[in-house]
Amino acid sequence: MIGNWNYGTGRRKSAVARVFIKSGKGDIIVNGKPVADYFARETSLMMVRQPLELTNHGATFDIKVNVVGGGETGQAGAVRHGITRALIDYDATLKPTLSKAGLVTRDAREVERKKVGLHKARRRKQFSKR
């Protein structure tokens, strides 16, 4: 805990989010913008708010997020993971609820690297019999 802020780091693909939460009225600020302005897609907004709605803390905390790297979906996943960790830092009794929903586990899937002699990671050149 930093001052009266609780902290959590979230990661997803190549995105990293640093999340700070404190008691407030439910404002979520991502990189200096309101969350609705920062994330254009409704699915990204739902993803970010998921841990708060699951624990019935939708309007309990003010959240400040710094997120870098990745695209919109990766950043939304990183913010969700960070909020989850910050909530656990605030109140450890929330961990079983969040864990049951699968929000505590870091999604370890990363982009597979491109291999030499192939078009992409797995896409081969077209085979010609003749």
From Swiss-Prot:
GO cellular component: cytosolic small ribosomal subunit
Matching InterPro entries: Ribosomal_Su5_D2-typ_SF, Ribosomal_uS9, Ribosomal_uS9_bac/plastid, Ribosomal_uS9_CS, Ribsml_uS5_D2-typ_fold_subgr
Gene Ontology molecular-function annotations: RNA binding; structural constituent of ribosome
Superkingdom of origin organism: Bacteria
Classification via Gene3D superfamilies: 3.30.230.10
Pfam families cross-referenced by the UniProt entry: Ribosomal_S9
GO biological process, one term: translation
Keywords per UniProt: Ribonucleoprotein, Ribosomal protein
Signal peptide as annotated in the record: none
NCBIfam families reported for this sequence: PRK00132.1
PANTHER family attached to this UniProt entry: RIBOSOMAL PROTEIN S9 (PTHR21569), SMALL RIBOSOMAL SUBUNIT PROTEIN US9M (PTHR21569:SF1)
Family (UniProt): Belongs to the universal ribosomal protein uS9 family.
Protein name: Small ribosomal subunit protein uS9
